[in-house]
C-alpha cells in the first residue's frame, strides 16, 4: 500500500499518509492509529 489513511492502525509515522501521524487515541496507550 502507498500509505495508511486516517484511522488505519500503524506502528510508525512513516507508514501514514502525508500529514498524518501515528498516534494513540488515548495518550501513550496502544493501539495507535494514523491521526492528525
Curated annotation (Swiss-Prot):
Predominant location: secreted
Disulfide bonds: 3-17, 10-22, 16-34
Record InterPro entries: Huwentoxin-1 (IPR011696)
Keywords (A to Z) from UniProt: Disulfide bond, Knottin, Neurotoxin, Secreted, Toxin
Keyword Secreted belongs to the record: yes
Highest taxon listed in the record's lineage: Eukaryota
Domain comment (free text): The presence of a 'disulfide through disulfide knot' structurally defines this protein as a knottin.
Protein name, per record: U6-ctenitoxin-Pk1a
Organism of derivation: Phoneutria keyserlingi
Organism ancestry: Eukaryota, Metazoa, Ecdysozoa, Arthropoda, Chelicerata
